[in-house]
């Protein structure tokens, strides 16, 4: 049995899409276990670019089984559009290769409206959400009023649950926000149509995954976002509403923790962040601009420019610890090409006191001054390099120094956006 979990080791946008695509080709089952269409990654295959938000990237391989787990919140409209877009590009999406958990919660228009109104009401203190209704959907799940895929498949159950929810939501829209609510019949009929279109894909994916694992299938779990956006372990409250850490795979897919063999942490060769929140190594100068433009650091889902900074070892050691990362995949090493000097944040200082562990307090994190170690850069184009030995000397020194500081070895190094622009240091 080989069960591998891929997690982002920073604030998301680490390049998990490419790494997942590479490993998906070598797996038999690919699973999403948390998040919704607030996440997104871009995969390039045979010169065609695919932007995926809900469906695992294994869908690009016709012989793989792709699973949307119970921990994912599903907007049926967004999912159906993604299916149609893939089919339009010649990708087969059918009940044999796409499975949706009957326990996954469903995103409704009122969730999206709640998201928008709540963010607007926070003014300058908004969290910078994608306004896709993800947080409000997870909140309904926690409040035990959420509607799941299995409910959507049963017209009578769905009718009763939607009716109760709309009465409650419409009252909130009117009394608190002075806004119009939603028409019951319109949502009911629209979502009944969605239900029939999605019905062939919906099943008990926990049983499916258990049986596949017992058969010895190679299973790959792909997390969305990153460790520092985790609801518990991220920079709260500037976090997502789910658990991108490796432990989230057990809850979000219904597999036991003892079934996980490997955890691969994906880390960019520098650091980026979308939206608000503290960022100790952020660069608000020409180097930050260089990284953003050369690395094309703009959100797949929102198009928002990402904040850029140097790599942060305190953060990476933290991610390794809370997810039990067994190896790392380094991405966008090529983006650093052309920089004369490259800095590595090896620790923080608060009022002269050295901080070695990532703080829980946002107030403390805001006060953290990065302690830097400077290394020589390189000017050679590395996109054609396929072995570690062929990298420029300073690039090799940089990678080796990161391994020493983090205490975990790299198994994959990405040197460009294309699938083949990859150095593989370990067989999977």
UniProtKB/Swiss-Prot annotation:
The note on cofactor binding and number reads: Binds 1 Mg(2+) ion per subunit.
EC class of the enzyme, as a word: ligase
Xref: Pfam families: Adenylsucc_synt
PROSITE patterns on file: ADENYLOSUCCIN_SYN_1, ADENYLOSUCCIN_SYN_2
The coenzyme or cofactor needed here is:
Mg(2+)
State the SMART domains in the record. Adenylsucc_synt (SM00788)
Where's it found, cell-wise?
Answer: Cytoplasm
Reaction catalyzed: IMP + L-aspartate + GTP = N(6)-(1,2-dicarboxyethyl)-AMP + GDP + phosphate + 2 H(+)
Q: Which amino acid positions bind IMP, per UniProt? A: 13-16, 38-41, 130, 144, 225, 240, 304
Q: What is this protein called?
A: Adenylosuccinate synthetase
- Please name the source species: Caldanaerobacter subterraneus subsp. tengcongensis (strain DSM 15242 / JCM 11007 / NBRC 100824 / MB4) (Thermoanaerobacter tengcongensis)
């Amino acid at each position: 049995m080989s069960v591998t979990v891929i997690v982002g080791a920073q604030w998301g946008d680490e390049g998990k899409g490419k790494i997942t695509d590479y490993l998906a080709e070598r797996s038999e089952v690919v699973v999403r276990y948390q998040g919704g269409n607030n996440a997104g990654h871009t995969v390039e295959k045979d010169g065609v670019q695919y932007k995926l938000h809900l469906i695992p990237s294994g869908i690009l391989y016709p012989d793989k089984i792709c699973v949307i787990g119970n921990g994912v919140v599903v907007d049926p409209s967004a999912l159906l559009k993604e299916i149609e877009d893939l089919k339009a590009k010649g990708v087969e999406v059918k009940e044999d290769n796409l499975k949706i958990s009957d326990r996954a919660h469903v995103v409704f228009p009122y969730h999206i409206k709640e998201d928008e109104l709540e963010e607007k009401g926070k003014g300058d203190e908004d969290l910078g959400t994608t306004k896709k209704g993800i947080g409000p959907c997870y909140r309904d799940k926690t409040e035990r009023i959420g509607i799941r895929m299995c409910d959507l498949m049963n017209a009578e159950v769905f009718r009763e649950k939607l009716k109760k929810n709309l009465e409650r939501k419409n009252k909130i829209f009117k009394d608190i926000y002075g806004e119009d609510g939603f028409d019951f019949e319109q949502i009911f009929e629209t979502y009944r149509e969605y239900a029939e279109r999605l019905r062939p894909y919906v099943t008990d994916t926990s049983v499916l995954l258990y049986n596949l694992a017992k058969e010895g299938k190679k299973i790959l779990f792909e997390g969305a976002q990153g460790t520092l956006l985790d609801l518990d372990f991220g920079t709260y409250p500037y976090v997502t509403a789910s658990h991108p850490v490796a432990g989230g795979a057990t809850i979000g897919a219904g597999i036991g923790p003892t079934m996980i063999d490997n955890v691969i942490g994906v880390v960019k060769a520098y650091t980026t962040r979308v939206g608000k929140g503290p960022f100790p190594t952020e660069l608000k100068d020409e180097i930050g601009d260089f990284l953003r433009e050369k690395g094309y650091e703009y959100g797949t889902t929102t198009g928002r420019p990402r904040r850029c900074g140097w790599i942060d070892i305190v953060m990476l050691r933290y991610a390794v610890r809370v997810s039990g990362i067994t190896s790392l995949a380094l991405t966008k090493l090529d983006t650093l090409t052309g920089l004369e000097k490259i800095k590595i944040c090896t620790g923080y200082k608060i009022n002269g006191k050295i901080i070695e562990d990532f703080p829980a307090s946002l107030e403390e994190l805001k006060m953290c001054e990065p302690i830097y170690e400077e290394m020589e850069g390189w000017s050679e184009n590395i996109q054609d390099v396929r072995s570690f030995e062929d990298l420029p000397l300073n690039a090799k020194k940089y990678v080796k120094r990161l391994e020493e500081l983090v205490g975990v070895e790299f198994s994959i190094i990405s040197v460009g956006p294309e699938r083949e622009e990859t150095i593989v240091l370990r067989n999977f």
